[in-house]
Regions:
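Hydrophobic face of amphipathic alpha-helices that form TPR/SEL1-like repeat modules
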Residues: 1-26, 52, 353
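Conserved C-terminal structural/oligomerization subdomain of aldehyde/semialdehyde dehydrogenase
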Residues: 29-33, 220, 311, 338, ...
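Residues at or immediately preceding the N-termini of alpha-helices
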Residues: 25, 39-42, 63, 81, ...
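ALDH superfamily catalytic-core signature
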Residues: 222, 230-375, 438, 485-488
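Glycine-rich loop-to-alpha-helix module at the N-terminal edge of alpha/beta enzyme cores
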Residues: 31-120
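Residue-level signal for inorganic ion chemistry
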Residues: 28, 66, 88, 110, ...
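Rossmann-like NAD(P) dinucleotide-binding subdomain of oxidoreductase/dehydrogenase enzymes
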Residues: 122-266, 395
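Short, well-ordered beta-strand elements within core beta-sheets of diverse protein domains
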Residues: 31-37, 54-58, 146, 256-259, ...
Length: 489
């Protein structure tokens, strides 16, 4: 499989003709060769997007017509659901059942924003001045740079592509250089759906060249990035060149608060899913369990008993419950954090090593890992490991639980498990996080905004706020009967 970039309506190789091999993290086998773009390719793509916005018709196309094209993209994704899911599993190692669910969600995102495209027509505002009208309209921002991570390649791309197109923007997308396959395929579907040349451009390549140019270019009006906090900070600095609009989702260290009166079996099951789904490579992973002390020992025993039976393997095998980590480099990072946890005095209750099973030796697998006797000042509690590593703390009261949960630079998501709905709502109201789940973990949908407090990011994706990120607000005032002011006589 040999894949190119998509610039100004044409499939092209990199200017340098360089290529990158994409490997399957399950067995390290090569699955594709893709064009390896550079700053020059990014410049070409930005120029195409700039021309398409300034001189083209997309921004001025009736909103309902743009919505029809975005809806068609969603329909095509549904039609190619299985093909896309297979590519996603090859590229990321996740189970194909996860990938199929992702494709359903992705199609829904495009269809949702297609429906919103003509629902943001603005509003009339009563003018306090006589013989005048006043209205507020929303217009597209312009050229959008979009940079997506490797853990949910197409899902994260959809969260950016769909609202940007629905609002009338043009764009340059840069997916992670190690997981670009499904994004390339969807750009093929853009062509079929009728997206005009230059409106949506795709550049493949590393962040330090392609991503850096998108962040710095004065021809880019907005930069949207999902990824690590350090990279996000660099993007903020680079975007200051022309004071771009910025939308950042920078991950989290998400607390899962378990009260003693919670449904025990549900809480254990949800804690496992929160921590170990997709091998913990989820920005909203419930990597911090904060459990009421009176049930701590019982909860830990149940958690360990369940976690040690998680079946690792090939994402295409029906009995596989979790796949590998994305790369050797990332597994090394996870291993370093496990070593740090042990040095800090946490108790390793499970895992903490690579599996010994012969069939898993070629892949980047790591066993589900649980640390107990953790405190909130430990690095493994405070920093995003982004792997199958769960820390467990205890609390004495609701106030103690809230204080520990909020003791973080992050504020993306969190959960509360209790049968006392009053207590649940009270705790949820005090958590400084963009999403709080009660007696559940992980649900999200296109209609509800997603984003974080504190250093988890700026702005929102999904929901109406997700569309508004890609618009500018303009106030238009009209004097119906203008007279000379005669201020300066």
């Amino acid at each position: 499989m040999r894949l190119q970039m998509y610039i100004n309506g044409e499939w092209v190789d990199a200017v340098t003709l360089e290529q990158r091999e994409i490997i399957n993290p399950y067995n390290r086998e090569g699955i594709a060769t893709v064009a390896e773009g550079s700053e020059e390719d990014a410049k070409r793509a930005v120029a195409a997007a700039r021309h398409a916005f300034d001189e083209g018709t997309w921004a001025r196309t009736p909103a309902n017509e743009r919505g029809e094209i975005v809806h068609e993209i969603g329909r095509l994704i549904r039609a190619h659901r299985e093909e896309l899911a297979d590519l996603e599993t090859l590229d990321t190692g996740k189970t194909v059942s996860e990938s199929l669910d992702d494709m359903d969600d992705i199609a829904n995102v495009f269809i949702y924003f297609a429906g919103l495209a003509d629902k943001e027509g603005g509003e009339l505002i009563e003018s306090p001045l006589p013989d005048s009208t006043s209205k507020v309209v929303r217009e597209p921002v312009g050229v959008c740079g979009q940079i997506t991570p490797w853990n949910y390649p197409l899902l994260q791309a959809a969260w950016k592509l769909a609202p940007a197109l629905a609002a009338g923007n043009t764009l340059v997308m840069k997916p992670s250089e190690i997981t670009p396959l499904t994004t390339v395929k969807v750009f093929e579907l853009f062509e079929q759906a009728g997206v005009p040349a230059g409106v949506a451009n795709l550049v493949l390549g590393p962040g330090h060249t392609v991503g850096a140019h998108l962040s710095e270019s004065t021809d880019v009006d907005l930069i949207s990035f999902t990824g690590g906090i350090d990279t996000g900070k660099r993007i903020m600095q680079a975007a200051s060149t022309n004071v771009k609009k910025i939308a950042l989702e920078l991950g989290g260290k998400n607390p899962n608060i378990i009260f003693a009166d919670a449904d025990f079996d549900v809480a254990v099951d949800q804690a496992l899913n929160a921590a170990f789904f997709h091998a913990g490579q989820v920005c909203s992973a419930g990597a911090r369990v904060i459990v009421e002390r009176s049930m701590h020992e019982k909860f830990i025993n149940a958690l360990v008993d369940r976690a040690k039976n998680i079946k690792l393997g090939n994402g295409f095998a029906e009995d596989t419950q979790s796949g590998p980590l994305i790369s050797a480099e990332h597994r090394n990072k996870v291993e370093k954090y496990v070593a740090i946890g042990q040095e800090e005095g946490a108790t390793l209750a499970l895992g903490g090593k690579r599996p010994e099973t012969e069939a898993l030796q070629q892949g980047f697998f790591y066993l589900p890992t649980i640390f107990t006797n953790c405190t909130s000042d430990m690095r493994i509690v405070q920093e995003e490991v982004f792997g199958p590593v769960l820390t467990v703390e205890t609390f004495e009261s609701a106030e103690d639980a809230v204080a520990k949960a909020n003791d973080s630079i992050y504020g993306l998501a969190g959960a509360v498990f209790t049968e006392d709905i009053g207590k649940a709502e009270s705790v949820a109201a005090k958590l400084r996080m963009g999403t709080v789940w009660i007696n559940d973990f992980h649900p999200y949908f296109a209609q509800a905004p997603w984003g974080g407090y504190k250093q988890s990011g700026i702005g929102r994706e999904l929901g109406r706020p997700g569309l508004e990120e890609y618009t500018e607000t303009k106030h238009v005032f009209r004097n119906i009967k203008p007279d000379p002011l005669e201020w300066f006589k």
